[in-house]
């Protein structure tokens, strides 16, 4: 039986999820590992992600393929 967390993982990131890039996005000067927040879903395959500095100032907003995003978790979850 698939849990809700596994279902969500298979569908990709949700709105307001914190994500990390799995590949560089050179067109937007973003490198693998940079962290952002999903701010909009642009169809089934793409999410709009906002990248901010430590003070919360956005320095990039880029459409990202959902397969290029890793959802980050800040509390323990069962694997």
Identify the function of each model-found stretch:
Residues 2-7, 13-78:
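Basic/aromatic-rich interaction segments and small domains that mediate binding to polyanionic partners
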């Amino acid at each position: 039986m698939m849990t809700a967390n596994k279902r969500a993982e298979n569908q990709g990131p949700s709105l307001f999820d914190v994500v990390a890039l799995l590949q560089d996005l050179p067109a937007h000067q973003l490198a693998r590992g940079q962290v952002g927040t999903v701010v909009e879903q642009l169809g089934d395959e793409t999410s709009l992600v906002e990248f901010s500095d430590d003070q919360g100032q956005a320095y990039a907003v880029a459409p990202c393929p959902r397969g290029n995003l890793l959802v980050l978790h800040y509390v323990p979850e069962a694997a």
